[in-house]
Amino acid sequence: MNILFVRLSYIGDILHATPAARWIKEHYPEAKLHWIVTPSMVELLKNNPYVDEIIPWERDEYEAHSKKLHIPTMWRMWWELRDKLKPYKFDVAVDVQGRLITGLVLLASGAPIRLGLGGTKELNWLFTNYKAKPSTDHVIKRYIEVAELLNTAVTEHSDLNVSSAVSEDNVKPCITNGAAGKKLYHMDFFVPSDLQVWAEEQWKSISYDTSLERSEVEKPLRVGLVLGTSWATKEWPQEKWYSLIKSLQYRANFVCLGGLKEATQYKPLMDSLTADGLDKIMLNMLGKTTLQEVGALIESCDVVVTADTGSLHI
């Protein structure tokens, strides 16, 4: 059984969808799960044992043309996507994004069985023939409920090439409490061992302060600071970041994480830290890391302080 899993973007949303992909592979291990995603997000799914193949598609480019009503270009890109997906001969497509653009991806997949969210907007409901009930539950639970529709689809389509897929365990509702519930809901992001080693090397490059106060700390805490966010209303003032670092200067080392935007935006903060000698206990990684490297650095931290942004979910 070939399955196309559709969650195109962005960091937090894709990570929230990983439990649903894992549910599918754990309940239907013989199925091949292909995840279609925006190219810039591919790294989030690398090394994920529950994803057999990552299919990149220029979702952002398509949306840009959509906003400008470039109909010929949109039509061309859709047909190119259709031609790209056709050789896979998908049996099932699973859409946990629920937008018009993902509905068009379902249509391009050619899959006869199309699972999706209930209560969606942008006409997405036109493209799915199995829908989860509308819900206000946590998004991870809602995504898993879409995946669980596969049980119903398999029982109704005997032509699907699935052996012993549906059992009593499969058709139980998703668990929502206790240790099993935590396992069900945990998000997947896999950091390879070579990047774990790389992260350790970054910490070793910090020049330790040899002051009396500092020397009393046997092993400073490793604190990750994710400085930026996409929304100005969610920003923490730069002077607050400075105060946090200053207050912990004798107890911690820091790594600053963010993209190229943050490298420019937070230059005043970096300059202030340098002027006060605090750069000696700081790794400035703004605009210097891939998503996998961000994951490795976050994994190596004791504490992470972050704005409401993608790396929060990592």
Question: What residue ranges belong to the model's regions?
Answer:
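Catalytic machinery of carbohydrate-active enzymes
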Residues: 1-314
